[in-house]
């Protein structure tokens, strides 16, 4: 297991362009494995299932914007014994209507590929064939180990049943530990989650994602959260500055997601359509 304290030292600095991201990504190596923090040092306080559910609702609300959302996403995909791959994309959301759009812009061979989600329906688009295909939440985004949910708002209280697992310590952070199991009829990337939440700031710091059989599939870390003021929400929206995802099936494989230029201004109404996405490749 990776030490969260060590992980913080390896965050990528401010990224302003794809070329800058490419240069910084070359310098960043994965931190070494470290022993898990001693659980005995964690402060033990009462933490019930009701408390856990309320905390999960708080996490959802902090990330939710009542209006629209735009972000520039940089993704570094690393596979063992291979050269890392770098991607740039645009992420668009309309949270109050459950609409989501993901559009690759770089590298050239990926540009124009896209994902569109409207309510419960998710499609992918390949401009080389001009075809749309239905997708599930479990499928990877493009050639990366990311999922659509890595870029969307949090809906854990709506999609999962919540159980408190007590308190813990993650690096220097006192945390609450929570287990979530998918509700019947919900389409999610992973049917079971374990999350570690900072007791002080109420931000998610770590996540483990499991298959239906209980096998650990991915571990994700959130070293830093940024606040962006939302005029429509009349409050702050919390956005992860960076997400580090470690593949637990293929050891040595990892994904780094960096989110920049987050904008919460209203988008054009005709954007969340197949026609709009197709027009970007003509």
What function would you assign to each model-found segment?
Residues 101-108:
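N-terminal post-signal-peptidase region of extra-cytosolic proteins
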Residues 31, 38-68, 74-75, 83, ...:
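Flexible, processing/modification-adjacent segments and terminal tails
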Residues 67-98, 202:
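N-terminal, post-signal-peptide region of Sec/Tat-exported proteins
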Residues 91, 113-117, 195, 257:
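Broad, structure-driven detector of short, well-ordered beta-strand segments within folded domains
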Residues 1-11:
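Bacterial N-terminal signal peptides that target proteins for export
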Residues 9-19:
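Bacterial N-terminal signal peptides
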């Amino acid at each position: 297991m990776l030490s969260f304290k060590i992980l913080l030292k390896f965050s990528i600095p401010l990224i302003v362009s794809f070329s800058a991201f490419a240069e910084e990504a070359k310098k960043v190596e994965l931190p070494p494995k470290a022993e898990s923090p001693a659980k005995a040092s964690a402060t033990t306080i009462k933490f019930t299932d009701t408390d856990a559910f309320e905390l999960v609702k708080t996490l959802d609300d902090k990330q939710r914007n009542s209006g629209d959302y735009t972000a520039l996403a940089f993704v570094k995909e690393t596979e063992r014994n291979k050269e890392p791959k770098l991607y740039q994309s645009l992420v668009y959301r309309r949270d109050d209507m459950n609409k989501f759009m993901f559009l690759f812009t770089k590298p050239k061979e990926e540009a124009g590929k896209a994902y569109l989600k409207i309510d419960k329906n998710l499609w992918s688009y390949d401009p080389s064939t001009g075809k749309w295909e239905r997708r599930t939440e479990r499928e990877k985004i493009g050639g990366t180990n990311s999922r659509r949910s890595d870029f969307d708002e949090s809906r854990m209280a709506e999609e999962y049943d919540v159980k408190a697992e007590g308190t813990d310590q993650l690096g220097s952070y006192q945390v609450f530990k929570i287990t979530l199991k998918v509700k019947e009829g919900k389409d999610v990337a992973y049917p079971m989650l374990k999350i570690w939440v900072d007791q002080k700031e109420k931000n998610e710091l770590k996540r483990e994602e499991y298959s239906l059989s209980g096998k650990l599939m991915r571990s994700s870390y959130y070293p830093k959260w940024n606040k962006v003021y939302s005029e429509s929400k009349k409050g702050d929206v919390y956005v992860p500055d960076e997400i580090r995802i470690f593949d637990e099936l293929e050891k040595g494989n990892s994904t780094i997601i960096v989110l920049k230029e987050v904008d919460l201004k209203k988008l054009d109404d005709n954007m969340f359509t197949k026609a709009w996405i197709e027009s970007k490749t003509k």
